[in-house]
UniProtKB/Swiss-Prot annotation:
Residues 367-404 are annotated as: Disordered. It comes from Macaca fascicularis (Crab-eating macaque). PANTHER family: ASPARAGINE SYNTHETASE DOMAIN-CONTAINING PROTEIN 1. It comes from the Eukaryota. InterPro entries: Asn_synthase, Asn_synthetase_domain, GATase_2_dom, Ntn_hydrolases_N, Rossmann-like_a/b/a_fold. GO terms for biological process: asparagine biosynthetic process. Keywords: Amino-acid biosynthesis, Asparagine biosynthesis, Glutamine amidotransferase. Residues 367-390 have a biased composition (Basic and acidic residues). The active site is at 2 (for gatase activity). Residues 2-184 form the Glutamine amidotransferase type-2 domain. This is Asparagine synthetase domain-containing protein 1.
Length: 643
């Protein structure tokens, strides 16, 4: 992962050959292993390229990279499939070599259509004065744009800065395809024209209508001197996943559990589905494709190849290379179980579990209430929860921490130990006080969440920032010790709910509009995931010099799930804890998981209790006053107090 930036100016007298201090600092946070800036000047324009690399594969390749013809490339991505990259090779250099050999725009589009994995990039094509940029189909890597001074300058960057309330603030580059700017003609006209090369399905006949709608939506958010137009050659990128299967059953579906609609969910209920040969086959196919996705994401990183045999034998001294955002819920449990298959057994796995602690919270009453509430919801026996959790609570660095995700996290840890007892599972208890939340939101997190600005963005953005930072406590047999995760790769379960009808709104839509309405809701979820979640989470996790990886959004996983009819993925006639994400729950049972396979969806902001920390009367969609733009006078203070 990297922090990449390109600042372009069409007015020489006002151009600085350096970035603002705060922007440079934010970029370096993302790429701590190397930094470099490159200045390119033409009669009509000046470009400053800035690259900051987090080294995760092959030979450390400093960015930006430049070839003998003056082409410049900045890459923030991972090639997991599509283009062959050997273990010792760096994908930045491999992709740049291919890109430099492209003879026309069609070849550039064909190249990026082949890449599977998360990416954003900036490419300066010197001979034609073109600047290309874009994000992958799902928008798994952040890229922002900022247009200022009535067309005199613009900037592209992985992360922005706080702009003190000025108009035309940073905005996310839409994950709509590739964009191209002709810098030479822009310098003359002072009107920035963005040519769009959109994603499309090759067989779709309505691509022109879709493209027109996309252009108008993008243009609506841009200044008057910036316009978005379809590329003149009508060329397109090929979408990397198959279309969503919108098929509806010709007759009423017969459920295997028609008599359980009002029965509390149990593991035995799920076992009934596993007697069906076809369902069992689909589950195994799902496990296989998801397992490969996890494997790519946990093995594609540098490990301690130079360790001595004596060092390797000291398992307790080994550092984790992979961490998982871990609530103990079904998504993180399945990811952890599959990661265990592929990560070397002598390597620990960090399970990052975050809880927000209100000062007034007291201990046993709230703990018992939460435990009983969870038990009632999921029909998990008190014996299954209480023995391990009570012991953990006795030794916890903060005995008052009994938020729902901590309780399910500890129970999930117990399950993982049963599935893989030889693995060292580092359950990292990350406890955040009101004071720490408010201080670091103000000085550090606020600008990472922006340009998103809702109460929901604030809650999830802050929770993910503290969780991925990985500073907390380990509760072990020999006592409690402070701990900071050194893992550079952070796995997250984003994408499971969107594809498998995991949200409560899916059940509401199904109840009002049936399977057809549910299909449309899922299509909408996947279509907007880049603008709702992924750019924000990439900025937040990347701020720690770590890389977010999303197994559920692997192109092959999405294509497999898209190919299935909706009733093989979810059955919302069944109760919570079974019907939503049914396919994933059945996969969890096949993988040997127990109580976690029945946990109903609980949003991170509620499970971690961040939603209860401040105002309780806010709606998730409200604009969040706590994210209001402030000046970065705190930057030097933040540097001094950074933990």
């Amino acid at each position: 992962m990297c922090g990449i930036c390109c600042s372009v100016n069409f007015s020489a007298e006002h151009f600085s050959q350096d970035l603002r201090e705060d922007l440079l600092y934010n970029l370096k946070q993302r790429g701590p292993n190397s930094s470099k800036q490159l200045f390119k000047s033409d009669v009509n324009y000046q470009c400053l390229f800035s690259g900051h690399v987090l080294h995760l594969r092959g030979v450390l390749t400093t960015q930006p990279v430049e070839d003998e013809r003056g082409n410049v490339f900045l890459w923030n991505g991972e090639i997991f499939s599509g283009i062959k990259v050997e273990a010792e090779e760096n994908d930045t250099q491999i992709l740049f070599n291919y890109l430099s050999s492209c003879k026309n725009e069609s070849e550039i589009l064909s190249l990026f259509s082949e890449v599977q994995g998360p990416w954003s990039f900036i490419y300066y094509q010197a001979s034609s004065h073109y600047l290309w940029f874009g994000r992958d189909f799902f928008g798994r890597r952040s890229l922002l744009w900022h247009f200022s001074n009535l067309g005199k300058s613009f900037c592209l960057s992985s992360v922005g800065t706080q702009t003190s309330g000025l108009a035309n603030q940073w905005q996310e580059v839409p994950a709509s395809g590739l964009f191209r700017i002709d810098l030479k003609s822009t310098a003359i006209s002072r009107c920035i024209i963005l040519q769009l090369y959109p994603w499309k399905y090759i067989s779709r006949e309505n691509i022109i209508e879709e493209n027109v709608n996309s252009l108008s939506q993008i243009s609506a958010d841009l200044p008057a001197f910036v316009s978005v137009v379809a590329n003149e050659a009508k060329l397109y990128l090929e979408k990397p996943v198959v279309p969503l299967n919108m098929m509806l059953p010709q007759a009423a579906l017969e459920t295997h559990c028609s008599n359980i609609s009002n029965v509390p969910p149990t593991r035995e209920t799920l076992q009934v589905f596993l007697t069906d040969v076809h369902i069992k086959e689909v589950i195994q196919q799902f496990i296989d494709v998801l397992s490969v996705a996890v494997k790519k994401r946990v093995l594609c990183l540098p490990r301690g190849e130079n360790l001595t045999a004596n060092e390797v034998s000291k398992m307790c001294d080994r550092k984790a290379n992979v961490a998982i955002l871990f609530s103990g819920g079904i998504d993180s449990m399945v990811i952890a179980t599959l990661a265990d298959r592929h990560i070397p057994l002598d390597e620990p796995i960090d399970l990052l579990n975050v809880a927000f602690i209100a000062e007034e919270k007291t201990m046993p009453t709230s703990f018992n209430k939460e435990r009983n509430k969870q038990k009632n919801k999921c029909e998990i026996s008190s014996e299954e929860f209480s023995k391990d959790d009570a012991a953990a609570d006795d030794d916890s660095p903060d005995k008052h921490v009994s938020v729902p995700d901590r309780i399910t996290g500890r129970a999930g840890l117990k399950e993982l130990k049963a599935v893989s007892p030889s693995r060292i599972w580092n359950f990292v208890e990350i406890n955040v006080s009101m004071e720490e939340l408010q201080k670091l939101r103000r000085t550090r997190i606020c600008h990472l969440i922006q340009p998103l600005d809702t109460v929901l963005d604030d809650s999830i953005g802050c929770a993910v920032w503290f969780a991925s930072r990985g500073i907390g406590w380990l509760v072990a047999q020999d006592g409690v010790k402070s701990y900071q995760s050194s893992a550079k790769v952070v796995l997250t379960g984003i994408g499971a709910d969107e594809q498998l009808a995991g949200y409560s709104r899916h059940r509401v839509r199904f109840q009002s509009h049936g399977l057809e309405g549910l299909n449309k809701e899922i299509m909408m979820e996947l279509g907007r995931i880049s603008s709702r979640n992924l750019g924000r989470d990439d900025r937040v996790i990347g701020d720690h010099g770590k890389e977010a990886r999303f197994p559920f959004l692997d192109e092959n996983v999405v294509s497999f799930l898209n190919s299935l009819p909706i009733w093989e993925k979810a059955n919302l006639t069944l109760p919570r804890g079974i019907g939503e994400k049914l396919l994933l729950r059945l996969a969890a049972v096949e993988l040997g998981l127990t109580a976690s396979a029945l946990l109903p969806k609980r949003a991170m902001q509620f499970g971690s209790r961040i939603a209860k920390m401040e105002k309780n009367n806010e709606k998730a969609s409200d604009k969040c006053g706590r994210l209001q733009i402030i000046s970065l006078e705190n930057l030097s203070i933040e540097k001094e107090t950074k933990l």
